[in-house]
Amino acid sequence: MVALSTLSGLSALPFLFSLVQNVYGVSLEVSTEKGNSSSPILYGFMFEDINHSGDGGIYGQLLRNNGLQGSKPGLTAWAAVGDATIAVDAQNPLTEAIPHSLKLDVKQGASGAVGFTNEGYWGVPVDGSEFLNTFWIKGNFSGDITVRLVGNNTGTEYGSTKISQSSNSSNFTKVLAKIPTKKAPDGAVLYELTVDGASVGGSSLNFGLFELFPQTYKSRSNGLKPQVAQPLADMKGSFLRFPGGNNLEGASEARRWKWNETIGPVENRPGRQGDWSYYNTDGLGLDEYFYWCEDMGLTPVLGVWAGFALESGGNTPITGDALKPYIDDVLNELEYVLGDASTKYGSLRASYGRKEPWKLTMVEIGNEDMLGGGCESYVERFTAFSDAIHAAYPDLTIIASTDQSSCLPSKLPEGAWVDYHNYNTADNLVKQFSQFDNKDRSVPYFIGEYSCQQDNAWPFMQGSVAEAVYMIGIERNSDVVKMAAYAPLLQLVNSTQWTPNLIAFTQNPSTVIETTSYYVQQMFSVNRGDTIHNVTSDSAFGPVYWVASSADDKYYVKLANYGADTQEITVTISGKTGGKLTVLADSDPKAFNSDTQTLVTPSESDMKATNGKFTFTLPAWSVGVLAAH
């Protein structure tokens, strides 16, 4: 991310909107001769934990502050129930990594249920699946523990279980329970754990590291939340860049994302202060990212820390001999990912349940090193990391974190890519339609982050059409632009640090906001060719823009109408007789989808061709995809 956005509304958008629309026409003829090859991994995802996109978002664990991690965790999200009090206890750590537990002090003479609740990440989404709950208990106890999922305002019970359990005051005991649930109508649900007050009056119990999971995406242990994962899977993306982004860098070298603290049992993961204002549990760790890639068929793009923190934080940039420990750390990480089970770190991975090495072909060195004082040292740092990685893993593709020549070696290593980020206004994205037409083809581009940023809390129709125009320009040049990702990807509506985002959600299990930009990304990603074809036209680009591709015997023509007038479109593709037309449109350029309204969704229609000619209307402010066969 380039900078923190605080923009929140659409009121300042300088739109001109006419109730009277003119009708114009564009005729296109698609060549069936073989054209330029198109990147097979052009569309994909950039992910970092921002807007609670990880914890509280796609990561399936539902309880907030569940491990009381960090130096001063407090009791955020927790509340006592009955004749009892709760406190953060540093005298009874669960593990070295989880140095606090939740102490339940029960009053002498207590009666009824005593315990505590957790409100989750502004609610607990109960989707009707069987939930898995684990926690640890320490203290002299023998009896029943009741766990419920209960409406915060209504008291309605959406799931419960009773656990017969004993524990002692010497060691923590792990407890596992399954909770059958019924779907809640909203996210206003609490997790509640209670015991009988009369049986523990005048004593205390300690609890540690609570986990609550619904049935996860692909039933993966410690996996993803289906509510958020499925819309991503529906996009049929090709790659995932992780773990960031700013959230890779940290505020200092000590607060960087440390791969080795995100692996293994979660009780051995300390978490870290993230770079977007909240603590990260790191339950979604290195292996979980690779499982995510595996389960969605995504090519992993692993970002590695490169001696530079945000705004030159801590002692960074780190150069010279001081870089060696960090280079070694990256090599250890790569051995963990790629080494067989006979290697030191490959055997560690195998001990955590993954015997086979992960599939990894691309590594990005750093993040946005052209910013915050990183440029001057990046030539040295990039070269040091690149040389070491290439020597150990010569088949890996290395990606530089910037395309700015002043920050890069005069000659990039053979096969290296550059990463370019572009947050811009709608009009400027359209002006950049031809940005890559004359780029040097010897240096492949990864557009690692882009989107329309224009005082908009939500993606809106004009901005999404502008993104489509930009994407058409990218696809026309997908021999040199190899990958491109909208950013940011995900947003929990209740806790947002950046707007707009591609997909938003609340803790209502039925509420996922698929934005206008989401639909554009989906339309372009699921309709992909491997060859770009020449198109002849009776008019120049603007306000209608287009690109044509094919795969096997199917042709795809993608169009964007960046204007307030209707366009009559004729597309001729020799030998094609039919197809499907998908259109996303709204005559109001300000139209947007949000948590309170869904105004814009794609429409589909079957198409018939006469002598290879398709005729259809492209409305004002619209994006269309013709899939012809």
UniProtKB/Swiss-Prot annotation:
Q: Which GO terms describe its molecular function?
A: alpha-L-arabinofuranosidase activity
What pathway does this protein act in?
Answer: Glycan metabolism; L-arabinan degradation
- GO CC annotation: extracellular region
What GO biological process term is on the record, naming one?
L-arabinose metabolic process
In short, the EC number is: 3.2.1.55
Instruction: Give, as one word, the top-level EC class.
Output: hydrolase
* Keywords annotated in UniProt: Carbohydrate metabolism, Glycoprotein, Glycosidase, Hydrolase, Polysaccharide degradation, Secreted, Signal
Per the record, what are the reactions this protein catalyses?
Answer: Hydrolysis of terminal non-reducing alpha-L-arabinofuranoside residues in alpha-L-arabinosides
Query: Could you tell me which InterPro entries the record lists for this protein?
Result: Alpha-L-AF_C, ASD1_cat, Glyco_hydro_b, Glycoside_hydrolase_SF, Glycosyl_Hydrolase_51
Which cellular compartments is it found in? Secreted
Major location, coarse class? secreted
Signal peptide start-end: 1-25
Indicate which residues are glycosylated according to the record.
36, 51, 140, 152, 168, 171, 260, 494, 534
SUPFAM superfamilies hit by this protein: (Trans)glycosidases, Glycosyl hydrolase domain
List the Gene3D superfamilies. Answer: Glycosidases, Golgi alpha-mannosidase II
Q: Which domain of life is it from?
A: Eukaryota
- Purpose: Alpha-L-arabinofuranosidase involved in the degradation of arabinoxylan, a major component of plant hemicellulose. Acts only on small linear 1,5-alpha-linked L-arabinofuranosyl oligosaccharides.
Q: Which PANTHER family match?
A: ALPHA-L-ARABINOFURANOSIDASE 1
Q: Name the family.
A: Belongs to the glycosyl hydrolase 51 family.
Please give the name of this protein. Answer: Probable alpha-L-arabinofuranosidase A
Source organism per UniProt: Aspergillus oryzae (strain ATCC 42149 / RIB 40)
